Amino acid sequence: MSYYAFEGLIPVVHPTAFVHPSAVLIGDVIVGAGVYIGPLASLRGDYGRLIVQAGANIQDGCIMHGYTDTDTIVGENGHIGHGAILHGCVIGRDALVGMNSVIMDGAVIGEESIVAAMSFVKAGFHGEKRQLLMGTPARAVRSVSDDELHWKRLNTKEYQDLVGRCHASLHETQPLRQMEENRPRLQGTTDVTPKR
């Protein structure tokens, strides 16, 4: 793993969390229980504090950063999609930030909210609970339905389960030269399917 102390501050990672070896954690970073940090994620706590609360996931290629004297927070069971950028913001409990979205300084995403993929949330935005946000700049278009929240929670559970799966079986290896006969397919732990 790539952990770096910065000006005397060392990242804190709960023993039940999984941090991919290619992720980078610098300085004032706090990672809670059962958190998943994906490949190539960058959590750069060299100005403000970065906090990833229990059960949350920060997926591949995400960036977290913030300003001095601020906390950038992903709340409990937060779900941060591939390539998202979080800068000096707060993501509420059980919220989802879609792939390649950008959440700017001082923005607050409400609990159980969903930010659609490729959205841009402006600095200082203050959302409410259970909003569907989308666009550039993002705006609330409606409330998150019970079905959508259930779908979000199933996806988050997949990542929570992936933590244990990675601890048990992920390791560096050499590639095969050809595909083996009857190669098995990997399965998830829930019945979640892509939202259409």
Swiss-Prot record:
Domain of life: Bacteria
UniProt keyword list: Repeat, Transferase
Region feature (Disordered): 173-196
One Pfam family linked to the record: Hexapep
UniProt GO BP: carnitine metabolic process
Annotated metabolic or biological route of this protein: Amine and polyamine metabolism; carnitine metabolism
Bias kind Polar residues: ranges: 187-196
Range of residues in the leader sequence: none
GO molecular function: transferase activity
Gene3D superfamilies given in the database record: Hexapeptide repeat proteins
Family statement drawn from the similarity comment of this UniProt entry: Belongs to the transferase hexapeptide repeat family.
Function per UniProt: Overproduction of CaiE stimulates the activity of CaiB and CaiD.
Database matches in NCBIfam families: PRK13627.1
Database matches in HAMAP family: CaiE
Name of the featured protein: Carnitine operon protein CaiE
Species assigned in the record: Escherichia coli O157:H7
Higher taxonomy: Bacteria, Pseudomonadati, Pseudomonadota, Gammaproteobacteria, Enterobacterales
Protein encoded by which gene: caiE
